[in-house]
C-alpha cells in the first residue's frame, strides 16, 4: 500500500469572496446548507460531475453551497462534509461548470469551501483539522 501524503496548510484569512476572472471584481460570498429543491439544476446533464442529490441523502453528511450575497440563487460550488470525532472530512467538493477550466468565470470557489470546512472543524474544537482524499480521476480545473 502506498504511503499517504500529508499536507500541512494554515488558512490565514477567510476572505468570503470570489473574483470575476474578466473584470477582477470581488463578490462577497455566503456558504449555507443546500436544499434538495435547489439541486434541481445541479445534474450531470448540466455539466456537474457528481450526484449531489445522492450525497444530500446521506444522513451523516452536510452539503453546503457557495453563492454570492447579491445573487443567492446561483450556486458557484458545493461541498459535502462529514463530521468526524477529531476532524471534518471533505467527502466531495466541486466547482459549478462555469467555474472550471481556462474559461472559468470566477476563481476562489474551492478555497472558500475548504476554508469553510476548516472553520467548521475549528468551531467543533478540532483546531481546523480537515481530511480529503482526492478522487482517482482528477477533473481538469
What is each residue range found by the language model?
Residues 139-141:
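Short, electropositive alpha-helical surface patch
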Residues 1-104, 112, 116-131, 137:
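Non-catalytic substrate-recognition and accessory regions of acyl/acetyltransferase enzymes
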Residues 108:
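An anionic, turn-rich surface loop/hairpin at beta-sheet edges
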Amino acid at each position: 500500500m502506498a504511503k499517504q501524503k500529508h499536507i500541512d496548510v494554515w488558512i490565514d484569512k477567510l476572505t468570503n469572496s470570489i473574483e470575476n476572472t474578466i473584470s477582477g471584481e470581488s463578490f462577497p460570498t455566503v456558504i449555507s446548507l443546500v436544499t434538495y429543491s435547489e439541486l434541481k439544476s445541479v445534474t450531470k446533464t448540466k455539466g456537474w460531475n457528481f450526484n449531489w442529490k445522492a450525497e444530500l441523502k446521506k444522513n451523516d453528511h452536510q452539503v453546503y453551497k457557495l453563492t454570492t450575497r447579491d445573487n443567492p440563487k446561483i450556486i458557484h460550488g458545493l461541498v459535502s462534509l462529514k463530521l468526524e470525532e477529531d476532524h471534518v472530512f471533505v467527502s466531495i467538493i466541486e466547482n459549478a461548470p462555469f467555474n472550471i477550466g481556462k474559461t472559468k468565470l470566477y476563481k476562489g470557489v474551492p478555497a472558500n469551501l475548504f476554508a469553510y470546512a476548516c472553520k467548521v472543524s475549528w468551531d467543533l474544537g478540532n483546531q481546523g483539522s480537515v481530511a480529503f482524499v482526492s478522487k482517482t480521476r482528477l477533473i481538469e480545473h
